[in-house]
């Protein structure tokens, strides 16, 4: 597993998808590292290789479709759907609420895999899961390129990722970078106040 992790990390670094500095994550937490998977996803050949790791882990699961939240989950959903020959759609926020638009639907009883680029707290995935279940679908699993959860963050669904990266994240009040007076960069896509 370590060699596979190193292989994925090397690709992420090659694409400048692993950044260092002081970041405000979309979860609201602070970190000294940030995974900007959009930098990976701009290269279809590299995205295919990285997501093949996830495909190999989930290919025997019973599911009907793949759903990714905008923005980070859209291309991941597409690529997993493409490799597994499953339909894929995406959710997006409308007035702060995760919704299906553009004529997308999840039919009652459909088994769904949720995709993300990076999972830190799982908040976006859980919002999508709530929507899927409200519509009568069943969440089978969550998939991501990067699992960067702290050890104390558990999800109610299995998470299958290309790579697990141990990166410390902090509540703002506990952030050592804030205490040093370093300004943060807010690269995430969720609207944070």
Curated annotation (Swiss-Prot):
The keyword Ribonucleoprotein does not apply. Its cofactor is Mg(2+). Orotate binds at residues 120, 148. Homodimer. Its EC number is 2.4.2.10. 5-phospho-alpha-D-ribose 1-diphosphate binds at residues 116-124. InterPro entries: OPRT, Orotate_PRibTrfase_bac, PRibTrfase_dom, PRTase-like. The gene is pyrE. HAMAP family: PyrE. One of its GO terms (biological process) is 'de novo' UMP biosynthetic process. It comes from Clostridium tetani (strain Massachusetts / E88). Pathway: Pyrimidine metabolism; UMP biosynthesis via de novo pathway; UMP from orotate: step 1/2. Transmembrane segments: none annotated. Catalyzes the transfer of a ribosyl phosphate group from 5-phosphoribose 1-diphosphate to orotate, leading to the formation of orotidine monophosphate (OMP). Belongs to the purine/pyrimidine phosphoribosyltransferase family. PyrE subfamily. This is Orotate phosphoribosyltransferase. Keywords: Glycosyltransferase, Magnesium, Pyrimidine biosynthesis, Transferase. SUPFAM superfamilies: PRTase-like. It catalyses: orotidine 5'-phosphate + diphosphate = orotate + 5-phospho-alpha-D-ribose 1-diphosphate.
């Amino acid at each position: 597993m370590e060699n596979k992790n190193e292989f994925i990390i090397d690709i992420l670094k090659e694409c400048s998808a692993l950044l260092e500095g002081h970041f405000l994550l979309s979860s609201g937490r602070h970190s000294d590292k940030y995974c900007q998977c959009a930098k990976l996803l701009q290269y279809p050949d590299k995205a295919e290789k990285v997501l093949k790791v996830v495909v190999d882990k989930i290919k025997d699961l019973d599911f009907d479709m793949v759903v990714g939240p905008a923005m980070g989950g859209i291309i991941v959903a597409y690529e997993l759907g493409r490799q597994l020959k499953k339909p894929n759609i995406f959710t997006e926020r409308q007035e702060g609420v995760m919704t299906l638009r553009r004529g997308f639907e999840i039919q009652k009883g459909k088994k769904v895999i949720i995709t993300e680029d990076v999972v830190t707290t799982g908040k976006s995935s859980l919002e999508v899961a709530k929507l899927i279940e409200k519509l009568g679908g069943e969440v089978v699993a969550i998939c991501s390129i990067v699992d960067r959860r702290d050890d104390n963050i558990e999800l109610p669904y299995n998470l299958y990722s290309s790579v697990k990266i141990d990166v410390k994240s902090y509540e703002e009040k506990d952030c050592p970078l804030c205490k040093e007076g370093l300004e943060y960069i807010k690269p995430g896509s969720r609207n944070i106040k």
